[in-house]
Each structure stands twice: as structure tokens, then as C-alpha cells.
Amino acid sequence: KIRLFNTQNGEIYVGLLDKVIQFCKDHEYSYEFIENKFYGLPFEVNDMISKEGVKDYMTSVSKYAPREYQIEGVYDALKHNRRLLISPTASGKSLMIYSLVRYHVERGQNTLIVVPTTSLVEQMYKDFADYGWDVGSYCHKIYAGRERETDSQVIITTWQSIYKLPRKYFARFNVVVGDEAHQFKSKSLISIMTKLGDAKFRYGFTGTLDGT
């Protein structure tokens, strides 16, 4: 059973914040947002991000020209710090993930990319190389039998390889990207996301949502 509200510490998932606000309004409760050193304020918007700037950036970091919907997706994600993006099969999802990762790496931030299978770890790594990046200098792959400790800025891993690791392992990550995000309802994946307490930037990609 998955509990969305922690009665011990009063925490609730930020994705439910709009429902909490509506509840307060319906019952005429007052509320206040207090700035957090990691997250800032809820619904924070990055005014420095522009669609034209995102287009130019994506073009500069990849040898493939981005499509309009890819630019729109990356722009929306960077503008709001956290987004769930619907990206069907063959829509160029990895280019969007790659662009987000490159943006954060250039700002000295560490990124954790979580995928469901070993083959997707390898595919993501290969795609990043195909886009023209020196992946060996920045990315580390984790799945069964591979070393989990690394100084690399970017880790591409299956969730099965890391969900049992202690919270301190996740402390260095500023960014998390979840592929096949519709699977993130499972307790193991929720455990990973909860341990990423310092990750202000959270992006999910999925080809489908089941409405739950």
C-alpha cells in the first residue's frame, strides 16, 4: 500500500500541491509558502529561459536539428524545473533527455537518469554518443555487476540497481530524469525519488499514462 501523506513528518508529494491548495481554498484555510534552499518556492518559473534560447542551445549541442515539439518540451521542462512529458515511441525522446542533461552538466550539476531495463541504459548511452557528446568523460552506466560508486556527473542506471542504496548515495544529485515515468508508482521507484531530497530538477518521460 502506497501512502501519499506521511503522518509522521507532515510531508506530501509536491505533485499533489495543487490539490492541497484547492482544499485550503474550499475550506477557507490560510496557507503560506516558505522558501526552501533546495527547491525555492513552489511553482517557481525561470524567467531566463526562452524558447528561442532553448532552440539555439539544442541545435548547438547535437548534430541533429530538433523538431518543434522537442524544443517545446525541453523549454517547458527548463522553465518550470519539473515536468512530466508525454513522448510516444519514435518521437525523439532521448534527444530531449540529452538536451536537459547537457544543460545541467554545463552548470556543474549532477544528474541521475533512471530507466527500467539494462538495454535502455545501453541505448541511452549510445544515443548520447550519437548526438556528438564525449559520453565517456561525463556518463557512467550502472546495472547488474557494474560499479555503483563514481565521480561522473551523469549516471544512467536501472532502478533495480539502486533502489536499495542508502539515502546518502543520492545526496549529490541535483537532477533526476525518469524514463517510462508511468512505472514510477511502484514502491521501489517511489523510494528512489524520496531519497533524492536535494534534487530540485525532476523530469519524467513516458509514452503513455494510465490515469492513476
Residue ranges and their predicted role:
Residues E68, S94-S99, T118, K187:
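Phosphate-binding Walker
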